[in-house]
């Protein structure tokens, strides 16, 4: 993201944010940030050197400068190899075909943004429980699903973060996710855990400190035990942000999500204005509000005419 766009939204986090975030640094952390940037400049890196990005890497490595440099260098290598630097442009060049697949997939595997949580973070829902993997993999592949994830991370940083930060009046860096496993079979749960691990690998290795809260609701009996098998492969910081809930989740969700922003099906009061609209086509938030859209422009409309914007 260019410096000019960074200048159009807050670059300081809320005073209540965690230590080590922009605006909440100790003298030692400030010195580590300067040294980290200096090393990267010496290595001829020129992109993604803003305070917010560098501090996310430093926090992920507990302000160990050498480990943070190693992580940043590996991420830049991966970005080039995977195509993350051009993934939005590639999508725009193949928008019609990708959107057709995404619209079909949305009915089988609803994934949507719907307003913000109490901290002003984008609120993201995934309804993974009712999917039929055999049918879904006739439309897409796990590889493509992970590529869609990377594309969403890039869209998140480019469009959702700036708009949410302008609305909140302070820097928003993370999201709040609700993963609904209602109806999932235990056999499918193994595949789900494998997918969650792949998602977590990409998240914690290449997009550090983007996860704010991650709620897994309607988790079936035995899921927590299965999760313990995956936990050793996840960063402890990532694990601390994951909350596995059963069917009694409403009270916990409402601690973090305004009742007016939580869909009725999850115990809130939020409904779509047009009864013919579907939540899996929803994309409601500051990133669609002209008051908060800056020089980055409006986020691409993946669902075309289906997208709910108010």
From Swiss-Prot:
- Give the Gene Ontology MF terms in alphabetical order: phosphatidylcholine binding; phosphatidylinositol binding; phosphatidylinositol transfer activity
One GO term under biological process is: post-Golgi vesicle-mediated transport
Which Gene Ontology CC terms are recorded? nucleus
| Cross-referenced InterPro entries | CRAL-TRIO_dom, CRAL-TRIO_dom_sf, CRAL/TRIO_N_dom, CRAL/TRIO_N_dom_sf, PI/PC_transfer
Q: Which PROSITE patterns match?
A: CRAL_TRIO
Task: Note the coiled coil stretches, chain numbering.
Answer: none
Where the record annotates domain CRAL-TRIO, the positions are 101-274
The record ties this protein, via SMART domains, to: CRAL_TRIO_N (SM01100), SEC14 (SM00516)
Gene3D superfamilies xrefs: CRAL-TRIO lipid binding domain, N-terminal domain of phosphatidylinositol transfer protein sec14p
Q: What else is known?
A: Present with 2870 molecules/cell in log phase SD medium.
Q: What is the name attached to this protein's record? A: CRAL-TRIO domain-containing protein YKL091C
């Amino acid at each position: 993201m260019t410096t000019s766009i960074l200048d159009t939204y807050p670059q300081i986090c809320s005073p209540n944010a965690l230590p080590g975030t922009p605006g909440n640094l100790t003298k030692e952390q400030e010195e580590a940030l300067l040294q980290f940037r200096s090393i990267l400049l010496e290595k001829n890196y020129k992109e993604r050197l803003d305070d917010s990005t560098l501090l996310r890497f430093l926090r992920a490595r507990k302000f160990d400068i050498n480990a943070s440099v190693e992580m940043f260098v590996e991420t830049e290598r991966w970005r080039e190899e995977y195509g993350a630097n051009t993934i939005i442009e590639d999508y725009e060049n193949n928008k019609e075909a990708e959107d057709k697949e995404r619209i079909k997939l949305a009915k089988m595997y609803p994934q949507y943004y719907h307003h913000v949580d109490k901290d002003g973070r984008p609120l993201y829902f995934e309804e993974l429980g009712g999917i039929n993997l055999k049918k879904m993999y006739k439309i897409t592949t796990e590889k493509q699903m992970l590529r869609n994830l990377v594309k969403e991370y890039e869209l998140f940083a480019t469009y959702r973060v700036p708009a949410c930060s302008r609305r909140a009046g302070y820097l928003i860096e993370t999201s709040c996710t609700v993963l609904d496993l209602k109806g999932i079979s235990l056999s499918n749960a193994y595949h789900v855990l494998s997918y969650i691990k792949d998602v977590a690998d990409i998240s914690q290795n290449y997009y550090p400190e983007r996860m704010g809260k991650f709620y897994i609701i309607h988790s079936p009996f035995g899921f927590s035990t299965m999760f313990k098998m995956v936990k050793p492969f996840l960063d402890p910081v990532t694990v601390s942000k994951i909350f596995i809930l059963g069917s009694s989740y409403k009270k916990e969700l409402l601690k973090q999500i305004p009742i007016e922003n939580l869909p009725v099906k999850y115990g809130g009061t939020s409904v779509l204005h047009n009864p013919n609209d579907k939540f899996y086509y929803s994309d409601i938030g500051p990133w669609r509000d002209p008051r908060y859209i800056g020089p980055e422009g409006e986020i691409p409309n993946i669902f075309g005419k289906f997208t709910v914007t108010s």
